[in-house]
Amino acid sequence: MSAGRCGRLQEERGKDMSKDKYESPLCERYASKEMQYIFSPDMKFKTWRKLWIALAETEKELGLKDENGNPRITDEQIAELKAHADDINYDVAREREKLVRHDVMSHVYAYGVQCPNAAGIIHLGATSCYVGDNTDVIVMTEALKLVRKKLINVINELAKFADQYKDLPTLAFTHFQPAQPTTVGKRATLWMQELLLDLSDIEYMISQQKLLGSKGTTGTQASFLELFGGDHEIVRKIDGKIAEKMGFAECYPVSGQTYSRKVDSR
């Protein structure tokens, strides 16, 4: 189960649950406040709204028109969306979900209640995975960055420890048997080396993270081709603009509605 799908479970537990942290027995015992926030409902749904803003800005910048040839999206509508990007009206979304049984459509509705002038452009042309999968990638990337930060701190402290005890002798072992002398500092460098290998893997994973983008129902972007009158050149620009606005270098070049689930398994 991916990050966003796990996080979805806690929103359903009731009104009194905190929205700024991910809750589970394991989290309560072992997770940092920073990591709990990354997997929290607040992080998830605020990211959904950032993605909706990025999509609306992209469609406006690419010249989306209505049936009369007028701009479909205005600066005023985008400003309204931005004004309510962080104040999630959970109660409205919860009540709406009781009716429609769909988390994304419930939050589209709730956002529209706060932004009546922009309600018609929220999620325009997109599918649920536009917010669901892209948010999962963003959450996983932020979690990896936090692990990287903490790992670097541990390596730095171990380096100080190794230097402090570089001349302190101790007995080294081979095959779990006493062997030859070494120093405590040298032994600590072995731990550091293991963590540096881990750090290299994490750096690589972060560098390889890509967004899904906005591929439509089956990965063909058919809904966007319809919105833009069949102009393939314009539609090809959508993913790149969204990636840039969300702080990523690129999106996956091909997909179905979802990104490859190998991303989750890695």
Name these PLM-found stretches.
Residues K262-R266:
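A conserved active-site cap/scaffold subdomain adjacent to cofactor or substrate pockets
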Residues A83, G256-S260:
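Short linear loop/turn motifs
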Residues G240-Q257:
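A short, charged helix-loop
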Residues R5-D16:
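Short, Lys/Arg-enriched N-terminal segments with co-localized hydrophobic residues
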Residues S18-K245:
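A helix-coil-helix interface module used to build multimeric assemblies
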